[in-house]
Amino acid sequence: MLVAVYKGNKYKFVLNKRRKGIITRCVQKTDGSFLKENDMYHKPVDEKDLSDIYMIEFYIFFDAGLKGVSSWWKITEADLLDNKVKLRFAEGILPGWNIEEKNVCTNEIDFNEISCAKVKFVFEKINGKEENVIKEETKSWNEILQNINEYSNL
């Protein structure tokens, strides 16, 4: 997820052919310059007006017990189910995992099977200065759940 800080508030940052700017569902973070589109508010913003721009990614540690398969799994809010996390492997089919499509399989694990988690920030801009900085923080699973909730509700 791409995040931008504008006037001290965090927003999702959209940068594609259709639009460029910040979006939020939180009306309290908007002013008259935001355009309402369904339940979202959008404001075209130039990157020079943003104090921070960064990508945030969430990972959990789960050892699938298979040689050559990483134990760190990238997850998003969409991967969170009722007290389970859906892991996706897109480099082939793993034994005992559910086939989703060609060379893609999934497995659901219980929250209590997660021993460690981390959040990764890939900064493009910090405090108004262009920077290329990667920062990783190891956190508890509960802290990661709180972070995922916080960032998905920007």
Model-derived features: positions:
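Short, surface-exposed polybasic-aromatic patches that bind anionic ligands, especially phosphate groups
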Residues: 1-154
